[in-house]
């Protein structure tokens, strides 16, 4: 094993790799009692430390970076072995000698924590899974209280390095929020740091595939996507961008290497596949694509690499010995050289961010230090520059990993069970603050070719944080829509276009995550914690503030040609964005989806800003199409340049979009935003009132001045408008869209049903004789085919 001088480890880290933290708490909030120190962080959250020597630390940890949020009013008393800490909201009971949490009293009710009631969080990876996987604990619990044990994490020193804790110590965080899960996670973000604002371009469609493309093949493939008008924003090149067949290519040169047969690690472009890699990166950028490359850094830097001489010199190795530069994230000299020599030059040439594909376990030279965590930490900090918003793609490395988006969930099987697990898996990660999972859409490996599965996976992905197509290297496993049936190609193309159009909405929700601590995909019980039923529908979630999503994860029924998905609809009116069906709230119901739709329901008053620009541009659109649903609601429409850190200095625009319904009058307003270089000087707005049949009159005013506009039965088009302008559109005599009469809905079910026409005729005659709801219920109960029964149930009872 290669040895380094002590000076290697004592070298200072690049300043870019030093996190900004504030671990010392407000002195007024600290209580010392024997070998226990309690810090009142908020009126609902404590830090409790135990040290047999009575020595405590203010250093931040790998997870917790901040502890000073101002003075909190509280009182303390000792009751036998219990230290009682009382704030305005909670009475905490802590063991005075061990620091163990005993209970908390919230609104007069004593609550204890049972880890089996934890709502779970997420897990490191789904690699190799064929279906569900056990999840790690999250931060929130149905007990109303929870304990996060930070004792096993390392401490983060001022110089950016990590140190071990003293043995026998305890460091826990106690949360007591009842069923207020939203503020539970918000306050968790106070101590860990909030989720960053991810770049705008990550919200479009990604192309990725594990395949040894040539430069021309990859360029031609991107051109083919655009020829077919399928927008992409990110081009991923898996590990074959560098030399992989090391033995045959460098056998003689690497004969002294211990790892000569491993091609996963590499930093030198494969010039046989990419003869002009700089031109390749430039061409992808010219196509409007951002580029990410795959990394497997575990084998360090070996003698065949182009950068080996520089790395060897930086680490004090005689290059003539051809000794590998060992991968070692406990060595500051290595860390600095790793970024300065291996990565920064490629970034300057056009690599926009890195996909860190670490799969080599959790051990390193420092006890308790997971290399994945440190790779995520340093890589993310290294890319945080004013002109370049930080970004990585990597696996989850434990609580606090939300600071380092995006998450890569790993290589799963191609099957329905994996698909069925992913909606729950994605939304449930909100319980540990992890908001940006990215999956291999369509599955990665194994399984079988299934057009229907591909369609359903892609449909779900439109309403996930990231849509990244990916697959393994088999020649026939490409996820291009045209590799599937005609129906799958048409629908896959249509849904990828929809995802691209949704970037303005998703980006505004990205800001909501950053500013308000609300996950893009959020379990239903966050908004409805008092409803027990909200906990039962694990595959159902809110996609931003406006849309309820429950993906289809089962096959079509042969008779009905639909897939039945059971959903829970909260109070209010819910409208399917695909077919316009309107559902009653406060019910559990089956939604029967043909192959071209899934249950995505707009809430009452929903506002969905979308891009109507052509092509694959991801920037702020010139033509903004806004889908509006009747009701009363306001959203913040957020815009900035999408890729730099200038928003931190105020270079962003927020426009309030509001809808107000009063009788047959609907008023929609857009407050003036801020004009920025990244926003078109003049913009076209198309307002589509999705659940309005028609209206008598429309008036449009800009900055209070009546303005002419074009319009149709349910849309209004306004041109030549500045982002700073205040817009008011008023519809009078608006007629609300309604579902078809129940008789027509029932006939639709029969018309599309595969089966005996004589049996259908018999059923139809009986349905025609139904006069009351009870008549329908009695008849539906007698229908033998479950799938048809569910279709009738939706048509008769679920719709308004």
Question: Residue locations for each model-derived region?
Answer:
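Accessory, solvent-exposed terminal regions and/or long lumenal/extracellular loops of proteins
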Residues: 605-705, 723, 731-800
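N-terminal-proximal low-complexity accessory segments that begin disordered
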Residues: 17-18, 22-47
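Catalytic-domain carbohydrate-binding cleft regions of carbohydrate-active enzymes
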Residues: 4-15, 22, 92, 103-596, ...
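A surface-exposed beta-strand-loop module
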Residues: 81, 91, 708-728
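Surface-exposed beta-strand/loop patches in extracellular or lumenal glycoproteins
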Residues: 47-49, 53, 557-570, 675-694
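Solvent-exposed beta-strand/loop surfaces of large extracellular or lumenal domains
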Residues: 59-73, 260, 317, 575-595, ...
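A low-complexity, Ser/Thr/Gly/Pro-enriched, surface-exposed linker/loop concept
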Residues: 9-12, 16, 41-80
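Short, well-ordered beta-strand segments enriched in hydrophobic/aromatic residues
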Residues: 38, 46-48, 85-92, 548-551, ...
